[in-house]
Amino acid sequence: SATSGAANYTSEPDLTVAHICEALGKVSASLDMSHDRLLEAPAHLGVAGIVTQADAQTLARHLPLKRCRISDDQLTSTIGALGDRDGALVGVGTGSFVALKRGDMVRSLGGWGLALGDQGSGAWLGRSALQRCALVADGLAPMSAMIASLLGQFDDDRGQMISFARTATPADYARLAPRIF
């Protein structure tokens, strides 16, 4: 096994490719297998942010793997966690989803991405906290220690907050979530 950085195809496709390639290099080293041999092996990747078959095909074309299937991470996470057993999985990280597995059937809810959902995820919590900061800064909500801490991170500067939000990825928002608790 190997780890690399975040991979969300919807929000950061180029970084997703880079991190998958980095992980492949680490896997070949940990298995004492030639990199070329690893790239010939069949692989199935569950990647956050894969929404359509076209997304999966485009990502596969940008990877060095010769026999690669790609799906969203909900299916692979559910099967990986439950194996052959029936059960439920709540996936909460940068995004969020709930899945139910019964026999060969897997049904999931959520996983819509930050633009439309991901309630309870780190990204959703971080973005919601910044939205609350804006309300407090405008005098429409009361100040709290959490809000003061977040505002302080941006030097109480509206411009810094807006600049951050303009380019923030779900992972950027999720990094704010620990300040909430």
Locations of the language-model features?
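Short beta-strand-loop/turn "lid" adjacent to the catalytic site in phosphate-handling enzymes
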Residues: 3-9, 28-70, 166
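Stable alpha-helical structural segments in soluble proteins, enriched in small hydrophobic residues
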Residues: 16-34, 81
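Glycine-rich phosphate-binding loop plus the immediately following alpha-helix
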Residues: 108-153
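Short glycine-rich, Thr/Ser-proximal phosphate-binding strand/loop in the N-terminal lobe
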Residues: 1-18, 26, 106, 111
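Gly/Thr-rich phosphate-binding beta-strand-loop-beta motif of the actin/hexokinase/Hsp70
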Residues: 1, 87-102
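A mobile "lid/hinge" subdomain adjacent to the ATP/sugar-phosphate binding pocket shared
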Residues: 142-181
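Glycine/charged-rich beta-loop-alpha catalytic/anionic-binding loops adjacent to active sites
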Residues: 60-61, 66, 105-113
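Conserved phosphate-binding catalytic cores of ATP/NTP-utilizing and phosphoryl-transfer enzymes
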Residues: 65-90, 104-105
